[in-house]
């Protein structure tokens, strides 16, 4: 018997970066942990937090398939792009390369399920200059993510503007209040899509 044959209920796999990891939410461990608590209180579903600090599109492209296969993914959520923008002086991924990699990520995800939800990159607090990211850059990446998502008949949730300056620890990473705002927005979108997670 293979390991993934033991999983008999739906599995929601959330792929992404440190924002998905949620370590800056000292109250509940991030929006994915909050989503897990919400879903587990109502229905039988496995929610996997597959966020990795510092991940860019290049790293996610390498790990998505084996991790989705190991968990027999029923639904895949992709929340990626902040590190590709480059921050704290690091070089970002140019738009053309980001487009190519993100399209390949969607293609890989599509091998496991048609139920794919992509999340737009969060707005940043530009008054905090420590991260070096502009909302203009964020919007350019979000346009790419939305276009590629729609082209593959997947679903896109725009979260730009969902958070206020006080919802960040450093202008880029959400704090507990930021994660508390994100979790119900994402849960409602999953419910709106009508995917049977029970």
Describe the predicted segments one by one.
Residues 6, 37-43, 61-198:
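Alpha-helical cap/lid subdomain in secreted, periplasmic
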Residues 1-53, 58-59, 63-72:
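Serine-esterase "nucleophile elbow" of acetyl-processing enzymes
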